[in-house]
C-alpha cells in the first residue's frame, strides 16, 4: 500500500468523525415540519460532505499504483465496504427526503435516520480497520 493511499484513508477517517457527530446530535421530531426540514437540510449538507469523501476514495481506485494495493486483500475489501456505505448513505437520504417532503414527517422515519447514522459508523469502522492493520 502506498503511503499516499494510507494518508488519504487517514484523512477520510478524520473528516468523517465530525459528520458522524453532527448526525448523532440531530434531534428527530415526527411532529414538526420545521424541525424535519432543518434535519433534512443538515443531512443534505452531510451528503455533500460524504460525496467529497467518496471522491477522495475514488481517487485511490483510480490511481495507477492501486494495482500494487490489490495484493493487500483486506485493504481492498475494506475500501469497497467504505464506498458501499457512503453510497448507501447518499441513496437512502434521497429516498428519505422525498418521502418526508411528499408525506410529511412521520414517526416511523426515525429508523431511516438511524440507518443513515449506522452507515457512516460502519464506514468509519472499515477505515479504522485499514489503519490498524497497517500500523
Question: What does each model-identified segment do?
Answer:
Residues 4-135:
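Long, low-complexity or tandemly repetitive, helically biased scaffold regions used
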